[in-house]
Design a protein with these regions (language model features):
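Carbohydrate-active catalytic/glycan-binding domains of CAZyme proteins
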Residues: 33-444
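Secretory targeting and sorting signals
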Residues: 1-32
Length: 444
């Protein structure tokens, strides 16, 4: 086992100054890219341009029938009685399309024993895999990695691509190496391992995955480190690697969730972060702690062993702290950038929903516009605010997620830990629409 930690640090362009008065943030001048909100400009992957999800955008968040998920029935089926299942992704090619192996559909999920309380599952997480002939009747195959081989004390979400005859698996090494069950240990690094997939008429299995490497760590400049984050009150992120090849530059990249570099609380909201705010909207001072972004790393060779950190593709400074599980759909020359987030991670003075958010631009690094004007694609209904989460949009327009906590008729709740019904989302230009729902866990 070894660690390749080649990280090239690039500072983003300087942030404009602002003044703070009576707990309300007043922005000063805009950044040099402030005029580029037309959604037509694109840049090279290593450019320092970062698109913005602004407070003005987030103030437009509204729910209606086109973006509200159907209620999850409390009588949902459970795909396995062995483990809780949450963040899930399919086996893909580098072009992001799902793929099969010898007629088998394969998915990967964060799992934990069902003997563990549902709320504690994150601290026991391992990546498990499932396989199916019909893309919905899933058989649990066990852990993806051999015991004791992965970095960290638990495995958090990532992505898995079939490249030639090898399986490249990317994941979040969460916690210190061999750190045990410690919810206070928030260290997160991006990791990778290579294996092979095998199948016969009865089952799917994997070999390899014994040599893991850390491929990226937060640099403190573009991406906040754990130590920097500990000066603030908000949950920290450097996780969720999503691998793909950009069809334009032909390079292999990773998207991931991060926070803007610098000590928590030192960030100063710019006019560009705030956008064209309506009259009377005041920005609470504590908004400066909310600095979510969608990060980018680029492979420096064909082996996918060495990576360079690039500036973030999109920031949500003073808007939201979490831009989890970022992923990409490329369709009709447009790049659809998706992420998931929670109601509780929106900055003070803003409110959203647990659900799926998205943006569209003309290239990988470009002037992303929020879909539907606000970025909301799918949110949980008001009477079931935590019913499902961790949405993943596939190139075919299908959206899978897991069932979280569902209200019951007697006023109680039922924990899910299993896949929800797959939803169908229509994508057209910068608009989306909920178009239907399919079977539970249908991931073709």
């Amino acid at each position: 086992m070894y660690r390749a930690r080649r990280v090239v640090l690039r500072l983003a362009t300087g942030l404009a100054a602002l003044a703070t008065l009576s707990g309300v943030i007043t922005p000063a001048s805009a950044s040099p890219h402030d005029s580029s909100r037309t959604g037509t400009r694109q840049y090279t992957a290593d450019d320092d341009h970062t698109a913005v999800w602004s407070r003005a955008d987030a103030l437009k968040l509204r729910q209606d029938r086109t973006n509200t998920a159907p209620r999850v029935s409390p009588d949902f089926p459970v795909m396995t009685d062995k483990v809780w299942v949450w963040d899930t992704w399919p086996l893909t090619k580098l072009d992001t399309r799902t793929t099969t192996f010898k007629g088998w559909h394969v998915i990967f999920s964060l799992t934990a024993p069902r003997s563990v309380p549902f709320g504690d599952r994150h601290w026991y997480a391992k990546i498990g895999y499932f396989y199916s002939r019909d893309a919905k009747s899933w058989k649990y195959g066990g852990d993806l990695f051999p015991s004791g081989t992965s970095f960290g004390s638990r495995e958090w979400a990532g992505s898995t691509a079939l490249v030639g005859d090898k399986v490249q698996s990317f994941y979040t090494a969460s916690g210190r190496d061999n750190g045990g069950v410690d919810p206070s240990d928030a260290l997160q690094r991006l990791a990778q391992a290579t294996g092979k997939i095998h199948a016969d008429k009865n089952r799917v299995w994997f070999s390899g995955f014994r040599d893991h490497r850390i491929i990226a760590e937060a640099d403190g400049k573009m991406y906040q480190t754990l130590e920097q984050s500990q000066q603030g009150p908000i949950i920290y992120a450097f996780r969720d690697p999503f691998v793909f090849r950009d069809p334009r530059d032909r390079k292999v990249h990773l998207l991931f969730e991060g926070n803007t570099g610098g000590t928590a609380g030192s960030y100063e909201c710019t006019k560009r972060d705030l956008g064209d705010l309506p009259a009377g909207h005041e920005v609470p001072e504590d908004s400066k702690y909310y600095t979510g972004n969608i990060g980018l790393a680029t492979a420096t060779g064909n082996s996918m062993e060495n990576w360079e950190l690039q500036p973030p593709l999109l920031s949500a400074n003073c808007v939201n702290q979490q831009t989890e599980r970022p992923h990409l759909v490329i369709r009709g020359g447009k790049y659809y950038l998706f992420t998931i987030s929670h109601k509780f991670t929106f900055a003070p003075g803003l409110s959203g929903w647990d659900g799926l958010y998205g943006f569209v631009g003309p290239g990988l690094r470009s002037d992303y516009r929020p879909l539907n004007g606000s970025a909301l694609v799918l949110g949980n209904p008001e009477d079931a605010p935590t019913q499902q989460y961790s949405h993943y949009v596939m190139p075919n327009g299908l959206v899978e997620s897991f069932i979280d906590t569902v209200p019951t008729a007697d006023g109680g709740t039922r924990f899910g830990g299993t896949l929800a019904r797959t939803l169908v989302v229509s994508l057209k230009d910068d608009r989306t629409r909920l178009a239907g729902q399919l079977d539970y866990g249908f991931i073709p």
